[in-house]
Structure formats: C-alpha cells, structure tokens
Amino acid sequence: MNHDFQALALESRGMGELLPTKKFWEPDDSTKDGQKGIFLGDDEWRETAWGTSHHSMSQPIMVQRRSGQSFHGNSEVNAILSPRSESGGLGVSMVEYVLSSSPADKLDSRFRKGTFGTRDAETDGPEKGDQKGKASPFEEDQNRDLKQDDEDSKINGRGLPNGMDADCKDFNRTPGSRQASPTEVVERLGPSTNPPEGLGPLPNPTANKPLVEEFSNPETQNLDAMDQVGLDSLQFDYPGNQVPMDSSGATVGLFDYNSQQQLFQRTSALTVQQLTAAQQQQYALAAAQQPHIAGVFSAGLAPAAFVPNPYIISAAPPGTDPYTAAGLAAAATLAGPAVVPPQYYGVPWGVYPANLFQQQAAAAASNTANQQAASQAQPGQQQVLRPGAGQRPITPSQGQQGQQAESLAAAANPTLAFGQSLAAGMPGYQVLAPTAYYDQTGALVVGPGARTGLGAPVRLMAPTPVLISSTAAQAAAAAAAAGGTANSLTGSTNGLFRPIGTQPPQQQQQQQQPSTNLQSNSFYGSSSLTNSSQSSSLFSHGPGQPGSASLGFGSGSSLGAAIGSALSGFGSSVGSSASSSATRRESLSTSSDLYKRSSSSLAPIGQPFYNSLGFSSSPSPIGMPLPSQTPGHSLTPPPSLSSHGSSSSLHLGGLTNGSGRYISAAPGAEAKYRSASSTSSLFSSSSQLFPPSRLRYNRSDIMPSGRSRLLEDFRNNRFPNLQLRDLIGHIVEFSQDQHGSRFIQQKLERATPAERQIVFNEILQAAYQLMTDVFGNYVIQKFFEFGSLDQKLALATRIRGHVLPLALQMYGCRVIQKALESISSDQQVISEMVKELDGHVLKCVKDQNGNHVVQKCIECVQPQSLQFIIDAFKGQVFVLSTHPYGCRVIQRILEHCTAEQTLPILEELHQHTEQLVQDQYGNYVIQHVLEHGRPEDKSKIVSEIRGKVLALSQHKFASNVVEKCVTHASRAERALLIDEVCCQNDGPHSALYTMMKDQYANYVVQKMIDMAEPAQRKIIMHKIRPHITTLRKYTYGKHILAKLEKYYLKNSPDLGPIGGPPNGML
C-alpha cells in the first residue's frame, strides 16, 4: 500500500547511483516464534539497511508510520521491511531490489522458527561446492563463498528472512560483488539429495539429471516438488513449499508468508488427490461467498489441479491477516471466510463495466477448468503438470499436456488473465493497479502512473465484470478451442469480461502452432504466436492475425498481459501467456539469481520500470506476471516491455542489458552472460528456444548517461573479451566514446578483413559524423591506415565535397591529412579533394586546423597539382611568413615544391629579409632558407646580416638567424662575420665583450668559437682572456667561460688546432 510513497522518494534516482551497501540483516540467534516472513516488525529489525544520511526523502512527507498496524492489517507484523528507509512503513521497494524475481529458498515455516540452520549445509555444503566445476572461465572458484553462505545460514536462526540465498545476488548493491553465471547457478543450486527432515518432499525424477545444455533453464533440472504432485505454486507462492533445494524453479513470492502451503505439509498425511480436493473445496466456498471474484478463482484453478490463491479466506478475526499460517489453517477447516474488502482498479478506456455477473457461467467455467486441470494432472505424477513458461517440456507429449493445461486458463474463462492478475495483488488487495484509491485504512494511495501522465488513459472501476470487444471475445473463444476445452463462447466470455457482440468461434483458426510459441513477444509484437496466446490478446484485431498489432499492443500480448498491462504496467512478462508452457523463456521470476536478466521481459535501465506506453502499474499489488507465464510466480513488478514509456518514470530495478536482462553493477559481472540468451525484447524475432550464442543489445536502450547498455557495460569492464563482432549495431556509438574508440582502434590493427568489413559497413554510413568527432576521427584514421584500398577510397569519397569544412574542423583536418598520407596521390579522388581547396588557400593557411591540411597537401601531392597554392601566395609571402601558421606553409613549399614554384616565393623573402629576421615567425622562414636553401639564397641572406651582426645578435629572434649564418655560411662568409665581431669596438670595449654579456648574443659568440677556424679561434681566445674575471660576474658570461675551459682542457696552452669544426667544412 505504501509502495508509491516510497516511489516518490526514488523517482529521480537513476540506476547508476548505487548506494553504499550494508547487510540487510546481521546474523544473530533469534528463537522467537513470531512471524518470520518478509514483513518484520519494529522489534525485528536487525540493523538499519540504509541510513537516513543516504536518503533524506526516505520518509515521505505526510506519511506517518503506523506502529502495530501494517497495511495488510496484521498487528503482529507491523512494519514493512523497506530497503530505502529505516522507517518500516515505506513499501515494497526492497522487494524489487532484493527479493524481486525468485529467491531461491522456499522454507517451511517451522524451519523459519529456528530449525532451518541445517538446510544449506546439506544442500549447498562444501562437498557440493567441490563437485561443481567452474561454470565460466571468468568465474573464480566459489567454494569459499558457498561455505561462507552456509556459515551464515547456520548462524541465522531465521534462515534468510528475505527468502533468498546469499549466493543469489545478481543485483547486489555492492559494485565489486561477484555473481554466479546462469550455468553456475544451476550447478550450485542443482539436484538436492538431502531433503530436510520433516518436509517429506515427493521424489523429483528430473532433479538429478545433469545439466543438459548451457542454455537450459535451471528449472528444467530443479523442478518444483509441488509441480511433481500436480500442485501449482501460486504467484504469491507462500513458500514453505516442499522443495528441499535451492532452485530457480522453487521461486518464492514477494510476500513470503510460509503458510499458504502449510496446509499441505502434514508430512504426507494427505494424498495428492485429497489435497487437491480440499483446496478445490476451499476455493469453491470462497468463490461462493465472494461471488464477484468467483470467475477469478475458477480461472486461477485452471493451470493446475491446485492453484493457491491469495484471496482466501480465513476464519480468523477480521483484524488478523488472512494469509498467516493460523488463517490458512482455519481456512482449511472451511470455516467462514474473512472477506477482503474490494478495491477499485484502473481500466483503460474502451473497456466498460457490464454490471452483470453470470455466476452460473463463472461456476461452469470453474468446474470445467477444475475438471480439465484434474484430468491433466492424473496421467502421471512423474510428469510435471505445468512445466512453466520458463521451462522446456521434458517430453513432447508432456509439452502438449502443459500447453493444453496452460491454454485452458485463458480458454475456460476470459477472467483468467484478469483474475490471475488480481491474484497477484498484495495481501488484502484483490485488484491490480488503480492510479489512485483509498485503502481500507482511509489512506490515499497514489499509483506510480499518476506521476507519469497515466491518469488519462486509465480510470477507476468498481470490481465488476467489464465489456470487451467482440474480437477479444472471439480470441478467447479461439483460445478455448485451441486449448482443448469444451467451453462455448458464452461460457468463456460471461465471466469478468463480456463481449460487446458475440459471434461463434472461428473454428478454422483453432489449429495449434507450438513452434511459434517460441517467438519473443516484442512490445510491438509482430511475431507469430499460437492462437491460444494470440487470440487472447485484448486489443488484437482478431485471433487470425498473427502479425497484427492494434493500439500499440503486440498481437502476441496475451489477454492477461493486456489487461494486466492496463492495470500493472504491461505486467505480462512478455511470454505468450496462455500457451507458453512449452516455450523456453528466462522470465524474471524463473531465475534463482535476484535479477537474472531475462530474455525479453525487463525494462532497460533508466527507462520506466513500472509502466510502458502510459499504463499504470500496480502500486500496492505490484502487477504480476500470470501464473501460466512465470513458473515461480514471483511478485516482481512487471517491467515494461521495451521502455517506450516516459523516461521520467521510476528508475527501479537492476542494471540491464539491451534485451532487458538484469545484470549486476559489479565490474566483470557481465562475463557470465556472454553465451546466455538475451534476445532483445523490442526487435527480437528469433526463437527463445535457441537463443543466440552472443549477446544482442537493443539499439534503443539508452542509459541515463546517453550511452547504450552495451557501451556502458564495456566501460564498466564487464566484457573482458569483447570482440568486434560483438559490437554490431554499436560500432558508431563505440567510435564516439573515448574507451570504445580506443578499443576499436586496437582491434582494427589486428582484425581480419571480414571483421574490418563489419566495422567499415557501419562507420561508412556515419563517416562524416565520425570524421568530426573527437574520438570517432581516430577510427576513420585507423581505416586509412589498415583498411583495404577500396575502403580507403570509399572513405575518401565521403570526404569529397566536404574538404573545406573538414579542413577547418579540429578533428576533420586530421582525417584529411591521414587520407592524403595513405592514398596514393595519383588517385583521382585525391586530386579532386585537393582542388576543393582552390580559392580557399589563404583561409586555410591562416586557420589553425586548415594550415595542417595545406601542409599535408604540399608534402603528399604532386607539386604540379599545387600550382594554385603558389599562385595564391603571390604578393602574400611576407604577410604569410610573419603569420604563426603561414610561416609553416612557406617552409613546406620551400622543402617540397619545384624550383620554378619556389623562386617567386624566395624573391619576396629576400625583399623583406631584414624585417623577417627580427620577426617572431619570419625568422623561422629565413633560418629554413639558410638550412635548406640554395647557396645563392644563403649568400643573399648573409650579405643582409653583415654589418649588423652586433645589433642583430642582441635581438631575441635575429640572434637565431645570425647563429644559422655562422653555421651554414661559406668559409669566407663565416670569417667575415667573426672578424666583424672581433675587430669592431662598442664604446670602450670591443663588440665581442658586449656580446659575451648579452643574454642572446652570448650564444652567437659560443657558436663562433665552435665554428671558427683554428687561427680565428685563437684570436677569439686572446680577445676573451682579459675579460675572464669580469665575465664571472655575469650570468651569461659564465657560458663563455665554460666554453673556454672546455677548449683549454682539450688543447695545448698555445690554443693550437683542435680538429675540424663540427660541420666538417675544414
């Protein structure tokens, strides 16, 4: 009831924000005989699971905590165990996080009271762990973990109050936690040979079968013992069920009251037939005394000989919980039931109340359903009566039996789907999902849909029959015929749903198509389903239109799914609900892991967890998958099928991949799903029976960060061995991510041609986008390096027509440069690319990005193709030479262009040599000419320098040119420059003395010492010697002294020859 107020506190929280984790419960010894269900009283809190420091809104405004009165009216269990607050009255969100789909332990209530300690030791003991092989190369040995879990369970007097084995921690809030792989879970939770004493389970002939294949559902190996005797555990699955093993099949409901089946745990005192008869009597009485849900009960009995229903009825005082052990024991005596107050439920527009309830028709449907189910149950106790939506049939005949029994549910009465959805409600509530209503305590309960604009399409209805369209009625009739039932159209539609117009069933559409059961029910499902499942679609055009989808609901969505969706956020858990017993589905509830990512049922993270397409999910009853869909009947809120609803909805639940399979936030946790089924819920058309060997992510699954789930998983190191082929459909996105781009670059270097082609096919369509991307441009460049010629030319063709904007763009200019480097200049595409710059040369040259493109063109393209660049420079050489980027282009021209092309450039340079040598950029051009130019060009520059050596040597930029003149001038020119320094006087001192003290000129002196011929060097030394004492006072004079000391140490005192100069010109 309080679920939605809890949701208010969680609405804005993204799934990425995993909180610091505390244990929910610390082990301690508790021998109290009080209720040990999941709803613990105030006195039974062991430790606050989350502190208020993390959740300032964990106690919503105006929600007062009621001590001693929980929402289901039991004063003994007076608080709800909430994961978000130490205030116990805040809803069921712990269930979504902790117990969500199927905790692995179904415990006898007597074991809960203190004798449970030996169970894990017997089933998951060290010897069990030692026998288990590693399920995955990425999984480390888990013996230590298993033993630790055993220790905890032994210490814990209550067993595990949340009904979940510690190993089942798929959605663990600790990011570093390990997780069990699907196969590992099967092996670890595998066949149990040591049942606890007192439970007396029936033999399970399939429990000890080895794991058949990697993808086989754990339920196939660990069948529910209740299934063996034809007793079906219900959605509310009040455990205590006689399953002595951790089994994903033995899924436990959210509200773990332990007592629903306590009625049957008289240690084999009653036979199966007696139990079944007793339960049918109970429900018949309940239906009689509560006629408005008689159809619900009758439909609920259809899938198996017995379907426990949460809406029974205890003779206990009205103030007590009708679902406690005492209440059920009283109900077993068939005393007067305690009627649960009816609630309002939300119904989509277009479904109208009938205000009439044909009890006789409902009773007939109930009888028929019971008889059919009983007859289905009789043929053999060794065959599982209801394999469940997540299991494969053990034998073909059994699969047919299961299909018929399952389809009987929708066939017997259209109230099945709605009734089973009702049955999924919380204790005390018989309806699914009102957007807002008052509960029996007078508190206003607002459904999560109210915050996401769901109020409009859903209205409150009294719990009366509703009218449905004639096509849906025909669908129900066709389902009845296909399911093998003898119900007439009238009998099958006179229950909770009444047709607007009745028509005879279409017999020609009654053939069964078991193979098409395996199709994934995508949200806009166009997959072909059986008539029994398809014809029960609420909004389908008719039973004979496999691919039709009207009003946005997949034609494969079952009647229960559609009605349940209107009331519970499309809570059908996707499978073909009425006839999916033989389908291979990994439903959310079929896994022993907490949030095992199902094949096609869960909402992607960051998308609405509760609702899809604007339909309300259940606030307190938590809209349930139908019993025929989910073998474990977990109380997990039905996730939206494809997250097409409002992205502002509640972000609850675990991390999922693109197909919606829940994963842990722990790094490396994704490894175990690499070979598991994960077909996408939205785009999948592949069979669930044969899941793909590699993960498939949904392109539309966008994380709150904007990244897809595959990329998010990769960034969080969940894919240690990701390959390029795993990125199909995500290449462009990965290329635009820092880590994804680096990954693709590394793989492309060693990729096979086929793998490169896979990548190339995707990036070619987004080539321009990637070329201008900060990370994507590197992937394009890598293709220019390692791609085939055809691939290079194809990418170059994408550049063509965009050369100028790319050249001026920070990242695009790099792509163009790489293309120019990697493609031969004689290719026509290169010439065409270069010609696009014609008319924009100066713009590019002066651009910080474009100048690199022009330089690369000059370097890589034939000079004859670059005449337009030379022409553009005419009259602009001085300006460009003094430009920070233009000076670079001038130097490239001088290096690579022909003499005819460089001649006009040099002439302009010589005209401005004096200015250029003193310019911060122009001096580089002059130096470049001195280093690489022709001798006549060097001589022209030296002649410009002569007579100005002293002045220019003291200039910051010109001093560099003077050094280059000393280095690269001819011997005669060098001697003239040195003599100018030695012989010239600067006031009282020589020019040499002035230069030695100068911060720039001292480098010219050092260069002269190095380059001078021996005779000239001796003269320089004698000129310097008188100033040695003075030079020691100056910072730059010390450089000269260091140079002198080097020569004095190397040479004789007379400063004779010291060998040739460094340039070898002597």
UniProtKB/Swiss-Prot annotation:
SMART domains per the UniProt record, alphabetical: Pumilio (SM00025)
Phosphothreonine, modified sites: 183, 395
Membrane-crossing segments per the record: none
Low complexity composition bias: residue spans: 368-383, 503-514, 526-540, 630-650
Phosphoprotein among keywords: yes
Key words, A-Z: Cytoplasm, Methylation, Phosphoprotein, Repeat, RNA-binding, Translation regulation
Sequence segments annotated as region (Interaction with SNAPIN): 1-260
Name used for this protein in its record: Pumilio homolog 2
Species in which this protein is naturally found: Mus musculus (Mouse)
